[in-house]
Amino acid sequence: MNFIKVFIVALVFALPFSACSNYGKVLKSKDSDYKLSMADQYYQAGKYREAQQLYEELYPVFKGTDKFEELYYKDAYCFYYLKQYKDAENFFKGFLEVFPNSSRSEEVDYMHALCFYKQVDKVDLDQTNTTKSIGVMQTFINQHPGSPKIKEANEIIDKNRAQLEAKELRAADLYFKIGQYRAAAICYNALLSDYPESASGDEYKLKSLISYYKFAKLSQYSKQIERYEKVVTEYQDFAERYPQSTHLSEALEYNNLSLKKIKEIENE
């Protein structure tokens, strides 16, 4: 039994060294067709780093031949599967430039766009890649209106837009939290403008209204009437846009408080 255990352990440790040894032999080989065949085998086995190294070594050998397109195609996917999305993005783009009439062009164009999505950062970080992702995915939709990937592309755009919306909301909420009420109100209204179909539209409008109310309350006495009137205007817009909103009664309270304040100031 002990002998069997020792043998198994030795075998487990020996396999990686054997694989490394075989890969080393492939790298040293002078036979380009053999190297390409082995690169394809590594690719099929999911050993993308090994496949990639071989593919890139073979670029000058097969460039201009009928084997170059598939080599380039698989090399781009190696970067993607290794999660090196920036490099994959560049290689998929390069493929489209080198093989504009390829039967794979639609697929590769989608993968190029998908790489932008894969580089999107979390909501609390910079959203430059999110904006880029929306742009390139929309371009894909425009250029391939009949693609089976259209639904998936639209879903990615929706996710990206939701992330941008969440980022803007955080900024507005932060302004509100630190007492910068006018800036908060402007940001909440910007959310309505940027995302008119948002399910949270009435919440943004209510927060804008409340922000303007707090801004008016903290304003110089000489400017309060004008700023309470802004709250009333915001309420009228709220009631017109969202007559069935569950937040309507709360918005009405701030409207009535503002009207009361205006009357008090005018009567002094």
Q: Where do the protein language model's features map onto the residues?
A:
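Acidic, polar-rich low-complexity tracts and alpha-helical solenoid repeat scaffolds
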Residues: F3-I4, P16-E268
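Bacterial N-terminal signal peptides
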Residues: I8-P16
